[in-house]
Amino acid sequence: MSWSAKQYVAFEEERTRPVRDLLGALPPIDARSVIDIGCGPGNSTEELAARYPRARAIGIDSSQDMIEAARARLPNIHFKVQDLNTWNDPGPFDVILANAVLQWVPNHEVLLPAFAAKLSPRGALAVQMPDNLGEPAHRMMREVAAAGPWASKLEHASKARTPLPKPEWYYAQLKPVCSKIDIWRTTYFHSLPGGPGAVVEWFKGSGLRPFLEPLSGEERSAYLERYTAEIAKVCLPLADGGVLLPFPRVFLAAIR
């Protein structure tokens, strides 16, 4: 699946706020080695480096486009294209940040203990994942996909992500390898100017990618037209013409 840094950063402030909230929950350790997994265009890496200014920061992402944007943004930080499934750097890292990436990756029962094993003693694992598959905006992606002439092409798109396990499950995975675990869930109400169309633009940078990529240009336009019409039914304009986008997110902050 390809990614567009330009599309993603169209709502950079809203996408970056959860990173700040997550990093703010970590202890003020004297970190010397930190890594941003799934760093995207570098907005989260910038926050990580600011939180731990004495540390050597690294950013990895599977998207060449994202890495190029991150390098342009932060030329003094080392970024590389790296598939998370084949990432084998043993560390140790004082902080591992995984912001809005693990929702795309299966086998959390394997990944999370493996990440914790890469931490230095008292190192921190910081994870943030969208938990919004049940929200109308995501439900409509699947409904429009199933109801259109593109249904066979998009059969697998609805399976690109699966619902997140419950907090108790994550606690059970981390408890054997971590001394302290904080888990919380927050719903942000992002204020987006531009009406329902802004919601569509938001998800074109994230959740819609698996649905749009398999389609031809003509099919893509038709899909987006139908999806926008459905979004307009539930994301009603506010008095100023904007909309509020409810966006639930799950946070994990664990200390080895």
Each model region followed by its residue ranges:
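Conserved catalytic/acceptor-binding region of the Class I
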Residues: 109, 116, 122-194
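Conserved Class I S-adenosyl-L-methionine
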Residues: 41-43, 161-256
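A short acidic, Gly/Pro-enriched loop at the edge of an enzyme's catalytic core
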Residues: 88-96
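Class I SAM-dependent methyltransferase Rossmann-like catalytic core
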Residues: 1-13
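Short conserved AdoMet
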Residues: 27, 53, 71, 75, ...
